[in-house]
Amino acid sequence: MARYTGPSWKISRRLGISLSGTGKELEKRPYAPGPHGPGQRKKLSEYGLQLQEKQKLRHMYGVNERQFRTLFDKAAKLPGKQGENFMILLETRLDNLVYRLGLARTRRQARQLVNHGHILVDGSRVDIPSFSVKPGQTIALREKSQNLAVVKESVEVNSFVPEYLTFDAEKLEGTFTRLPERSELAPEISEQLIVEFYSR
């Protein structure tokens, strides 16, 4: 399944979550898109709830189904709970950590920065958004990319960097200091529903 490239607000409203990180797309119309307006949401079956939760998380991180399932299967081989491992693996993606550092305002924008070769990991250019960053590695902008308007705007408005990251706004450089705890990730997601979906 290809990655969705249409308007993110449609997905946000359909799934009831903000993909932009601002919540603005849900403020005026907190209901699914379509001609019927803010009618009552259809009650979902157990399968429907599981599918919806999977789609929420997949669209939140902006990955296609193949990448999503590959990471899910990888999480099963790690010690501990598969669902929690899965959430942590998604969080270690390079495009996500560029977003978390505040170098981009959305994950989609962060993915473009990586794709276009603006990002360095430990001093080497990495242009693969799914690259898995390890604790202790540094993430920085190439010197030639440090004057990008989108980066400057993002850094100016960003007021929060997770505790598992450190960030130097002057150098535009951050370090992934440790793996995150589950409690630090997406409280609105019930990963157990996703485990149940793939276990059917």
Swiss-Prot record:
Q: Which UniProt keywords apply?
A: Ribonucleoprotein, Ribosomal protein, RNA-binding, rRNA-binding
Cellular component GO terms, alphabetically? Answer: small ribosomal subunit
Q: Where is this region: Disordered?
A: 22-42
- Keyword Ribonucleoprotein belongs to the record: yes
Superkingdom classification of source: Bacteria
S4 RNA-binding domain segment(s): 92-155
Q: Which Pfam families match?
A: Ribosomal_S4, S4
Which GO terms of type biological process are on file? ribosomal small subunit biogenesis; translation
Give an example GO molecular function.
rRNA binding
Q: Where are the transmembrane segments?
A: none
Q: Which InterPro entries match?
A: Ribosomal_uS4 (IPR022801), Ribosomal_uS4_bac-type (IPR005709), Ribosomal_uS4_CS (IPR018079), Ribosomal_uS4_N (IPR001912), S4_RNA-bd (IPR002942), S4_RNA-bd_sf (IPR036986)
Quote the subunit structure annotation. Part of the 30S ribosomal subunit. Contacts protein S5. The interaction surface between S4 and S5 is involved in control of translational fidelity.
This chain's function reads: One of the primary rRNA binding proteins, it binds directly to 16S rRNA where it nucleates assembly of the body of the 30S subunit. With S5 and S12 plays an important role in translational accuracy.
Task: State the family it belongs to.
Answer: Belongs to the universal ribosomal protein uS4 family.
How is this protein named in the record? Small ribosomal subunit protein uS4
Q: Which organism is it from?
A: Bacillus pumilus (strain SAFR-032)
Gene that encodes the chain: rpsD
